[in-house]
Structures are given as structure tokens and as C-alpha cells.
Amino acid sequence: MLESFNTKSEMQYQRLTEEEKQKRGILGRLVGIIADFKNPTRNGRRYTEELWDKTFEDPIVKEKLDNRCILGELGHPADRQETDIEKVAICLAEMPKKGNDGKIHGVFDILDTPCGRILKTLCDYGCNIGVSSRGGGDTFEDYDGNETVDPSTYEFECYDAVLLPAVKAARPAYVTESFDTHKKTLKTALPNKPDKDV
């Protein structure tokens, strides 16, 4: 289960001293909201508290987190679920925490990679890029008529840095699912499932 804490802070960019950057091999950090389990995304899907608890209790996810291997790309890839190591920009730096407001808060390192440097440049410019989860799973309609991602089938891959996050609050002040106005494509849909039109 995710640890709880009491805060309503928004995602923020943390500048590091030159010494911290060299020691960590990173360009900066993103800290703030990464998911909302009380409200549907802009895509109309709900990612429940149960889904996120199960995700971060998974032994594979824990192993990847412990080894700093939950690596995210600059933008969601259009044609695959797995992460391309040559395109990584961020890394989930520690176990996310649940706020009392239904939001999950996380910390990401901006990596000193080509895509990480692009991301840092955008952040330095003032671009408030969001973060969005990537994974795969089935959906069902809940009792309120919301399309809900099934916690028992969801397979988490990572968080990516995106232009328009599906969770509106998932915007770092210095950087989960992209929102596509033309398709109801769940970036966390199984790769072999056909896209549904809006």
C-alpha cells in the first residue's frame, strides 16, 4: 500500500546545485501530483486507489523502483508499451505517496540524456509539461457509468513527460496519460486491442 501524507502541493521543479547534479547524474527534479484516484481523467477513465496500491505493491515494480529503472520518455510512444532506453528523459526516484485529497504525489529525476536535456530546456524556458502513466489493461463501466481501468489486468510500465496530461493537475512547475481530442485511445490499452473512436 502507498504511504499517505497530508499535502495539497502542486508539481514543482527543483533546481539542484552543480554539486548535486554531478553527484546524482541528473539535471533537476520534478515533484508533485502524478495521479488522481478520486476523479476520472480527461479521457473519462478512472484509475482507482486499488489500482495504484496494487501497482506499487507489485514485486516487479518494486524491483524496478529499487534499481532506479522506472524510466520514462519525452512523450508517450505511439506504437509500443515498453520503454526505449535511448529515449528516456525521467526516472521515478522514490515510492509515490498518497495525499488525503485522492491524489498521488511523486518525485522524478530529469536525467542527463538527450531527451532529458530537451526536457530541462523546455522547463528552463517556462514550459509546464505534465507527467502521465503508461501501461496496459482492460476497462469496465463502474456503477456511476465511468469507464474504469481494471486493477486485476493493469500492467504498469512507467510515467512519461507529456504536453497535455490526462490528469489536469499532473503538471510539474518545471515539467499521466496524454489526452487526444480525436480518439478515446487509452495509452494504457493492450497493444492488440483496437482503438475506439470518441
Predicted regions and their residues:
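Polar/acidic, low-complexity leader/linker segments enriched in S/T/G and N/D
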Residues: 1-66
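Short amphipathic beta-strand and strand-loop transition segments with alternating hydrophobic
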Residues: 9-22, 87-99, 139
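Short, charged/polar surface micro-motifs in flexible loops or helix N-caps
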Residues: 40, 78-79, 111-114
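Short conserved beta-strand and strand-loop elements enriched in small hydrophobics
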Residues: 60-81, 131
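Surface patches in mature domains of proteins
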Residues: 73-95
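Residue microenvironments linked to proteolytic maturation
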Residues: 92-193
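Charge-rich (especially acidic), low-complexity segments
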Residues: 195-198
